[in-house]
Amino acid sequence: MGRAFEYRKATKLKRWGNMARTFTRIGKQIAIAVKAGGPDPENNPHLRAVVATAKRENMPKDNVERAIKNAMGKDQKDYKEMNYEGYGPFGIAVFVETATDNTTRTVANVRSVFNKFGGTLGTSGSLDFMFSWKSMFTITKKEGVDMDDLILELIDYGVEEEYDEDEDEITLYGDPKSFAQIQKYLEENGFEVKGAEFTRIPNDEKDLTPEQRATIDKMVERLEEDEDVQNVYTNMKPADNEGEE
């Protein structure tokens, strides 16, 4: 397994611990996708990808359909995707992705958490160089498929040679700009796409003591308690026992 897998697995275990929070996060993604491309998943690849992620995370079908219906309503809030970047304690880089209908409220809340933990909120783009932004596709294993051949077919779309493999799933990483092309190829070639989203992987990780790690975990948890926050990424190296089953 690659470094991206270990980082993603460890952070996912924390991030998806609260089911209600997960459904709220996906609901906002559905609203953004519907506003951009319409309510029909068949004609809206972005929405189709979000619905696949909702299914993987066990979000009830009724909830998904209700979120799509609500997104078409005239009273639906207009969410804006905003990123906030800065440093937490111990020099750890913290990248916060949000979807908000009130940026003034959101930046105040995010800054408050940074201040509480002795961190500093920086300017937009200040941490771009510290993280690699990737498209990420989780597909069901398909009998008779040679992974080397599949990667070769997708290499023009920026899909990386290194991939993650679980018992019945494979996760591919690619160029974010080629998200739609990768999704189209996988669907047209009969792959079951169980999740399609974007992620950020730290280019270098910083090791901490258990006590320092606990402080960063608390900071991330506090950030994720804000309903506007979609994802929180750090360059903290996962503990040796994190990411294991």
Curated annotation (Swiss-Prot):
Coarse class of the protein's main subcellular location: cytoplasm
One Pfam family of this chain: TACO1_YebC_N
SUPFAM superfamilies linked to this entry: YebC-like (SSF75625)
GO biological process, one term: regulation of DNA-templated transcription
Region (Disordered): 225-245
Cellular localisation: Cytoplasm
Molecular function, one GO term: DNA binding
GO cellular component labels: cytosol
Claim: Calcium is one of the keywords in the record: no
InterPro entries assigned to the protein according to its UniProt record, in alphabetical order: Integrase-like_N, TACO1_YebC-like_2nd/3rd_dom, TACO1_YebC_N, Transcrip_reg_TACO1-like, Transcrip_reg_TACO1-like_dom3, YebC-like
Keywords annotated in UniProt: Cytoplasm, DNA-binding, Transcription, Transcription regulation
NCBIfam families xref list: PRK12378.1, YebC/PmpR family DNA-binding transcriptional regulator
Family of this protein: Belongs to the TACO1 family.
Protein name: Probable transcriptional regulatory protein BF2589
